Amino acid sequence: MADPSLNNPVVIQATRLDASILPRNVFSKSYLLYVIAQGTDVGAIAGKANEAGQGAYDAQVKNDEQDVELADHEARIKQLRIDVDDHESRITANTKAITALNVRVTTAEGEIASLQTNVSALDGRVTTAENNISALQADYVSKTATTSQSLASPLNVTTSYSVGGKKVLGARQTGWTAATGTANKGVFDADLTFAVSDTYTQSEIQAIANALITERRRTKALEDALRAHGLID
């Protein structure tokens, strides 16, 4: 803090010193001149002292002002250090967060690549399925369609065929011995009648025998048909 006493001027009690105030015929002229010169010197010294005191006071006032300014600067620097420390902490936290995000992004990129591979595989499977569906739509047998349907390939069933819920064709029957002789696939009159007299003539018996042969051949033809269709063996 500035010393206010430095601002107080030096007061010279004797403000005027010349030959008129000195006793006459006591001192020599040279001494009188010396005394007068001393008074002048004392005044000059007092002036310089006052200037020096004022300068010292002004310097102390300036120092006090600078001390206040330096204290403000120190406080601001301290706050800046606190802010910098806070920023460093936040930067460190952000760096860690960025590192974690990088890891997550890398993981996500790997998962995306895997998903892209899976999607490509699924695209291939979907394309194949679409082609299969198109093929099925162009060539399939419907359970609900009422129009005539056909198959180009053999059809295999485990038990039997039914029409209206009634069995019409079952599994092959085995144990049949194949008939021999000639099969009759020609004209066959199921209503043919025979004349029979009381004495059974030769011609009547021959007609019945011929009809029996025709029937047997017809039976052979039917058996051949059943075998051809795989119904008996």
UniProtKB/Swiss-Prot annotation:
Signal peptide annotation: none
GO biological process: symbiont genome ejection through host cell envelope, short tail mechanism; symbiont genome entry into host cell via pore formation in plasma membrane
Transmembrane segments: none
Record keywords: Coiled coil, Late protein, Pore-mediated penetration of viral genome into host cell, Repeat, Viral genome ejection through host cell envelope, Viral penetration into host cytoplasm, Viral short tail ejection system, Viral tail protein, Virion, Virus entry into host cell
Region (Interaction with tail hub protein gp10): 2-60
Region (Inverted coiled coil) residue spans: 175-233
Trimerization heptad repeat repeats: 61-67, 70-76, 77-83, 84-90, 91-97, 98-104, 105-111, 112-118, 119-125, 126-132, 133-139
Coiled-coil regions, chain positions: 61-139
Entry-linked Gene3D superfamilies: 1.20.5.340, 6.10.140.940
Motif (Basic cluster): 216-220
GO cellular component, one term: virus tail
Cell compartment(s), UniProt: Virion
Annotated family: Belongs to the Lederbergvirus tail needle protein family.
Comment field on protein domains: the N-terminus forms the domain that binds to the tail hub protein gp10 and plugs the portal vertex channel, the middle coiled-coil rod, and finally a C-terminus distal tip that is a tight trimer of alpha-helical hairpins.
Subunit structure: Homotrimer. The trimer forms an elongated coiled-coil (240A x 25A). The N-terminal tip may exist in a pre-ejection extended conformation, which may fold into a trimer of hairpins only after ejection into the host. Interacts (via N-terminus) with the tail hub gp10. Interacts with the head-to-tail adapter protein gp4.
Main function: Cell-perforating component and plug protein of the phage tail machine. Together with gp4 and gp10, gp26 is required for stabilization of the condensed DNA within the capsid by plugging the hole through which the DNA enters. Host cell membrane perforation allows viral DNA ejection. The needle penetrates the host outer membrane. The needle is released and the internal head protein gp7 is ejected to form an extra-cellular channel.
Protein name: Tail needle protein gp26
Gene that this polypeptide is encoded by: 26
